[in-house]
Swiss-Prot record:
Can form heteromeric complexes with LRFN2, LRFN3, LRFN4 and LRFN5. Forms homomeric complexes, but not across cell junctions. Interacts with DLG1, DLG2, DLG3 and DLG4. Interacts with 2 AMPA receptor subunits GRIA1 and GRIA2 and NMDA receptor subunit GRIN1. Keywords: Cell membrane, Disulfide bond, Glycoprotein, Immunoglobulin domain, Leucine-rich repeat, Membrane, Phosphoprotein, Postsynaptic cell membrane, Repeat, Signal, Synapse, Transmembrane, Transmembrane helix. This is Leucine-rich repeat and fibronectin type III domain-containing protein 1. Residues 299-386 form the Ig-like domain. The keyword DNA repair does not apply. Residues 424-520 form the Fibronectin type-III domain. Residues 1-31 form the signal peptide. Pfam families: fn3, I-set, LRR_8. Residues 558-771 are cytoplasmic.
Amino acid sequence: MAPGPFSSALLSPPPAALPFLLLLWAGASRGQPCPGRCICQNVAPTLTMLCAKTGLLFVPPAIDRRVVELRLTDNFIAAVRRRDFANMTSLVHLTLSRNTIGQVAAGAFADLRALRALHLDSNRLAEVRGDQLRGLGNLRHLILGNNQIRRVESAAFDAFLSTVEDLDLSYNNLEALPWEAVGQMVNLNTLTLDHNLIDHIAEGTFVQLHKLVRLDMTSNRLHKLPPDGLFLRSQGTGPKPPTPLTVSFGGNPLHCNCELLWLRRLTREDDLETCATPEHLTDRYFWSIPEEEFLCEPPLITRQAGGRALVVEGQAVSLRCRAVGDPEPVVHWVAPDGRLLGNSSRTRVRGDGTLDVTITTLRDSGTFTCIASNAAGEATAPVEVCVVPLPLMAPPPAAPPPLTEPGSSDIATPGRPGANDSAAERRLVAAELTSNSVLIRWPAQRPVPGIRMYQVQYNSSVDDSLVYRMIPSTSQTFLVNDLAAGRAYDLCVLAVYDDGATALPATRVVGCVQFTTAGDPAPCRPLRAHFLGGTMIIAIGGVIVASVLVFIVLLMIRYKVYGDGDSRRVKGSRSLPRVSHVCSQTNGAGTGAAQAPALPAQDHYEALREVESQAAPAVAVEAKAMEAETASAEPEVVLGRSLGGSATSLCLLPSEETSGEESRAAVGPRRSRSGALEPPTSAPPTLALVPGGAAARPRPQQRYSFDGDYGALFQSHSYPRRARRTKRHRSTPHLDGAGGGAAGEDGDLGLGSARACLAFTSTEWMLESTV
């Protein structure tokens, strides 16, 4: 196809057509759509796109790929994807500041070969990986400040080590940097590392940074700064005039000792740095402290392994070495052959100065040297290690003798190869044998010269494990502990000595012995606390239950005994009339009831007596007429007892409230003054208890009850009361008067007559009173 006029004009445009072509290109550029809410400035020959504060959540996909400057600041972009900046080969300046970027895809900037400035400050980046900044071979300015970066990979800056001029990593969480990579940035002008957690700067980092004009290490955790020609250059030393250099390291906990003396000798105009340690220089201005106060202390070894370490060949050993000084000493170890030891498959040096030898060999026998060094000097301490070679055990027999118990033993015994003879066995004695220990004795080995130590090896006949014990050559006894009870053991003692012929350690059997530990008797252990507590609870509960049962049994017996008596009394008193007004009477000074005296003939009262017969009890009541004329009242019960303990009689007496006529009425037949019996009347009788043998006397006007001051209460009740429920007051004064009296004229009142009053014995009265 032949080229048209337009294409030929582009290939060789005449001078008169140049303005027209510029306008045409601008029109074509304006034909590319601009993303919404963005500002596109097409000023030839550059294309600038401004999308600041537009609320973008991601990089707009409609961005012109020919853009030269792209600013996406103050948005909400959370991630940078691989396709966001693809094919933007003309992009020179990219600003992504003040977003929420936390992820950057690998190779996201790989097509930005012309990019000179990348601003990713004020985002949420946590780390910088080596594949994230790949392809930025022309980068000059990298701004990563005010993020959350904790780690930077060593290969992260490899793409622009020779081109970068400005590196900003301030306000992050960095504890370390790839100082080796930083030292290769030969065109670096500004290094900003302030407000991080950096506590160490590798020595020689700034040697090649001849173009560095500003180093900001403010507010980190630096204790010291390594000597570097960078700082010397700022003082004007050298053949070339110095480049202006500003170094800021204020806000660091500087340890002002001899290691910072080189920095103190420099001339500085600022006076912002202070010392944190040592204590006598705390909070003092660094540049105002005299040089003679920047001191160091030589190391002093404070703790080391014992003067001699004994270890069996093949076992591990640890050699400790501690040192103090200012600055803190560094510990190194030197092997017996003069080699400087480091970390290897067999040895390891810890940070605290401990040397671990995992597998010892015969070459390790000798003196190890601990060297502690710092800026003020060094200190050494020897540690001797003695490696005991493994004993040369005899080969196992072709046909081992049968064992009484299952198991095997590889100890040389008199009946097996490797043992000397029966005399060797006799030289070894097992004494003080218990269930878990035994004391082994053997004589001195004079025929064997140069004995270095003794080796005791033993095991049980049912155990395949062989136990070794190394003891000094001066010992002739050994106490073996931690044995199992009731088990047979084979034990041999070997002497380790130097064989002059081979110059190697050799062993010789001193003797062997077989023994059986005692059985483990069942120990008598005291009862535990919770067992004693349970026993006490059971015992106390048993006592309480027994007491309750005894109390119940006593109540049942008492109820049965007194319940039968109450029932008999109730049966005998069912026919008695209703009574009231209780009064207590005693026979006063009466001495007994051997013979009951008769009532006087002139008395106006007649006593009623209960006549008992063998067929059925009959009650004969005798009444006497009363002179007083009183109203009719209910019968009254009067209980009395003689002081001499005589029986108490049950009689009927008229109540005080009864009238004269009604009181004269008798229940049963009565005698007239002439002695003749008269028929009974229909008036109800009055029941009372009078003391047997007591003379009849007029009834007192004042009543008394068995309960003392509760007489009125008894007077207000008209229901009958049992005689056993009442109390007896023997101290009533007006009832203890002259009580005897002469015997009545009536002979029927005597004790010898066939008719007898119903009486309560003294024993029954006391039982009833107790209840």
